[in-house]
Amino acid sequence: MSEVIIHEDENFERALKRFKKKCEKAGILSDLRKHRHYEKPSERRKRKMNAAVRKNRRTRHG
């Protein structure tokens, strides 16, 4: 669980920005999106294979 302590001279928007940054770094939101629905093992393999193909294309052309 990400936790942010708000300092006396810090405003709420700044603390919220730090909290969002910590959550993003910890991978909480991406993990939540990934586990929102059940994914069959065959679908998971297909998704990973497509991601590898895209990554391979990017490295060859870029």
UniProtKB/Swiss-Prot annotation:
Pfam families: Ribosomal_S21 (PF01165)
GO biological process: translation
InterPro entries reported for this sequence: Ribosomal_bS21, Ribosomal_bS21_CS, Ribosomal_bS21_sf
GO cellular component terms listed in the entry, alphabetical order: ribonucleoprotein complex; ribosome
One function term, GO molecular function aspect: structural constituent of ribosome
Domain of life, source organism: Bacteria
Alphabetic keyword roster: Ribonucleoprotein, Ribosomal protein
Region of interest (Disordered), residue spans: 38-62
PANTHER family reported in the protein's UniProt record: MITOCHONDRIAL 28S RIBOSOMAL PROTEIN S21, SMALL RIBOSOMAL SUBUNIT PROTEIN BS21
Family: Belongs to the bacterial ribosomal protein bS21 family.
Protein name: Small ribosomal subunit protein bS21
Organism the protein comes from: Gemmatimonas aurantiaca (strain DSM 14586 / JCM 11422 / NBRC 100505 / T-27)
Top-level taxonomy: Bacteria, Pseudomonadati, Gemmatimonadota, Gemmatimonadia, Gemmatimonadales
